[in-house]
Amino acid sequence: MAFTEILPGIHYVGVNDRTTTRFESLWSLPYGVSYNSYLVIDEKVALIDTVEVSFGEQFIDNIRAILKDRPIDYLVVDHMEPDHSSSIKTLRLLYPEMQIVGNAKTLQMLDGYYGIHTLTREVKEGESISLGQKNLSFYMAPMVHWPEVMVTYCPEHKVLFSADAFGTFGALNGGILDSQLSLDHFWDEMRRYYACIVGKYGAPVQKALQKLSGLPIETICSTHGPVWQQKIGRVIGIYDQLSRYEGEPGVVIAYGSMYGNTAQMAEKIARELTVQGVKNIIVYNLSYADISNVIRDIFKYDTLIVGSPTYNGELFPEVGSLLQKISERCIPCRKFALSLIHI
């Protein structure tokens, strides 16, 4: 079996990005990020999603290393966000007979983004395409985290191609499968990815989890991060917990401070909570903290304390920015305290 072969006839052809510093120009990438794409090879060949176009040359090399001169029959587009779709025009030039498969919203976006409206095939909920011995079935997952999102399932191998669902920040360090990688940092990066990218859409994520719960799944192929096989239960559990907005016991103290007074207050609160036996306390100075880590931990823990001085008669700007991001993500079910110091 070739190194890229996840299962018989299913290959990884994705790429690592270790140069982009901020995902969506917002969220830091200390460990990089992967853009994952997969070939399913049978009597016919399907490619599941593409990669960021700036890595297109490497992507095409990965495909040709496996297919040689064999054509791609189908390109399945589970997600139209440009980090997964911007290589479509290149592929259409290289494989002009390739049929592009997507749902109605996908095909509208395909035309709007790239002017492609020929050799397309619309699929609906539960429909399948036969590749020979392997079949691909399609299930809609709208607003996880874009309106056109769907997932693709191969029942013969019990593989779910999950688009951005179950994804994580972090490039792949040599391996592809979870069994080949050190996963220590991926768990926090998964929570950070969910909180920043998917966090607003807990209800749609729950609907998708319920819809897919009846499928036997032994491999999850997301568009970001490792291919999951050994840790599927933990991965689904994290997404389930986060999308229910169920925090673990713990406290996030986030503050802004101009002259040290709010900082002193935050430290005293943290110490007193410790005296009272509270565990898992994290204190963030919002003028220095990576905001994506703060949002991650607000999703992770069940209590949030925010301290702010006033600034021009309003909240300190960094505190106001955090509260806006919390509001955007509709985070319910939290114990919350806000303290203002008028200085």
How would you label these PLM feature ranges?
Residues 81-83, 107, 286-292:
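Short acidic loop-to-helix transition motifs that present clustered carboxylates
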Residues 43, 54-101:
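Active-site metal-binding motif and surrounding structural segment of the metallo-beta-lactamase
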Residues 228-332:
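N-terminal beta1-alpha1-beta2 submodule of the flavodoxin-like/Rossmannoid cofactor-binding fold
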Residues 3-63, 151-154, 158-162, 251, ...:
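Conserved beta-strand hairpin/beta-sheet module of binuclear metal-dependent hydrolase folds
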Residues 342-343:
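Conserved small/polar residues in nucleotide/adenosyl-binding loops
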Residues 4-8, 101-222, 228-230:
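Metallo-beta-lactamase
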Residues 48-50, 73-80, 100-103, 160-163, ...:
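Active-site neighborhood of phospho(di)ester-bond hydrolases with catalytic His/Asp-centered motifs
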